[in-house]
Amino acid sequence: MTSTLNTLKSNSGSRKKKLRKGRGIAAGQGASCGFGMRGQKSRSGRPTRPGFEGGQMPLYRRVPKLKHFEIINQKNFSIINLDKLKDFNDNDTVNLDSLVKKGLIFKPKFPLKILGNGKVNVKLTVQAHAFTKVAKQKIEDAGGSCELLNNK
């Protein structure tokens, strides 16, 4: 048998009738409409908003406003700008140990990062754990080299 438009039928159970609540007890959802006897949840205009706790001070208002969350796995660096490297001579190697000896870094607690503020007039070999783009460019323009050390 071929199917034509006038013989098409939807599958059984695919089209469900909408429940009409509050239209008499014979309909099965009359009177209290399946919402129970009394109380806020049975009234019109339901439901209550998400997070409503029945008038009790809600959790989002009981908890204090937290600010300044710490960054998880934050990378801390001992930073130094290029203008501090003017004490070094031509062809010197700049690393964390040489900066401590010159007194430019006092406590070498973190890995070294070179920032690009200032000028470099001498040819230096700089060994650090991180460089900014500007710092790396200025060191290489002065004829020096940047060696990237691995972070531990």
UniProtKB/Swiss-Prot annotation:
Residues 14-23 have a biased composition (Basic residues). Keywords: Ribonucleoprotein, Ribosomal protein, RNA-binding, rRNA-binding. PROSITE patterns: RIBOSOMAL_L15. GO terms for molecular function: rRNA binding; structural constituent of ribosome. It comes from the Bacteria. Pfam families: Ribosomal_L27A. GO terms for biological process: translation. The keyword Thylakoid does not apply. The keyword rRNA-binding applies. InterPro entries: Ribosomal_uL15, Ribosomal_uL15/eL18, Ribosomal_uL15/eL18_sf, Ribosomal_uL15_bac-type, Ribosomal_uL15_CS. One of its GO terms (cellular component) is cytosolic large ribosomal subunit. Residues 1-57 are annotated as: Disordered. Residues 25-37 have a biased composition (Gly residues). Binds to the 23S rRNA. Belongs to the universal ribosomal protein uL15 family. Part of the 50S ribosomal subunit. This is Large ribosomal subunit protein uL15. It comes from Prochlorococcus marinus (strain MIT 9312).
